[in-house]
Amino acid sequence: MALVPMKQILEEAKKKGYGVGAYNVNNMEQIQSIMAAAQETQSPVIIQASRGALKYSNFTYLGYLMKAAVIENPTIPVAMHLDHGNSLDSAKKAIDLGFSSVMIDGSLKEDGKTPSDYEYNVNVTRSVVEYAHKYGVTVEAEIGRLGGIEDGVGSGSAHITDPQEALQFVKDTGVDALAIAIGTSHGAYKFKGAKVLAFDVLQEVRKLIDIPIVLHGASSVPKELIDAVNKYGGKMPGAEGVPMEHLQKAIQLGVQKINVDTDGRLAMTATIRKVFTESPEKFDPRDYLGPARTALQGLIASKMKAFGTAGHASDYAPLTLEDMKKVYNK
């Protein structure tokens, strides 16, 4: 099946009413875990790297590890996605490396922290759309603004998406998928009070726009993982995420792409802490990264089943980026 445009994966999900997880990666073990889970459940998958991950691992190193995931899993539809690109240059770099999808987050200025205005968002998004579509690459953008800060991205303040503005934004930019803000946030501390999402906003946006909708900040922060982290020496009091039933309701109401990063970090960290606590003599990285990889595979497989992605890997004939170039450049 190999590398496919994210647009195809999300449109198939929209047609059949399921969600697709987009799982953030920083290293080999995370990529292997995600792909093993995709094979186990026969799920299409989006593997995504943030600018922070690409800086940490080096753009080329991480990019080629992601390509290895495609090569080693020919029966699985895989999209390679840039998460929270901040400029046309960041998108170009990902496209040049072979990514099949890029996100441009024009809801913030190029520093990834300062809130932008509508005009700025439209201009930077349109420039990325015009460039990416020449290469058959999918473009995701964001309207509204999530709270929280993760991987150096975020202003800390939230701004719920205005449905009419979302409609105009899609018309003004020609973007392929739209991330909206309905009350989720980045990081492990998503709610200060009641866990409330603006499902009414999601429903209104879904009525107005026809393209796939994306939900960022969608980790569930399972209590058992927080308890395990804290049991083995961590300090994460009060961490809370989005309940799975909320995510499943969002999928039913029209979300196709669900971003997951924090949960993967927690699964690996809890396992590594456990290994070092119970076996302090261990020093071979394989002795702690191996169990962490297994734990993450289990977590991702459970999400693929809960999102409804499982069993859909063989549903459709894959499109190539060359195919998409013809679609975009008619």
Where are these regions (language model features)?
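An acidic- and aromatic-residue-enriched active-site/binding cleft used to recognize and process polar
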Residues: 144, 218, 263
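Alpha/beta enzyme core
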Residues: 4-12, 28-53, 59-75, 84-212, ...
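Short coil/turn segments at secondary-structure junctions
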Residues: 18, 50, 111-113, 283, ...
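Histidine-centered catalytic micro-motifs
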Residues: 21-27, 80-85, 212-225, 258-260
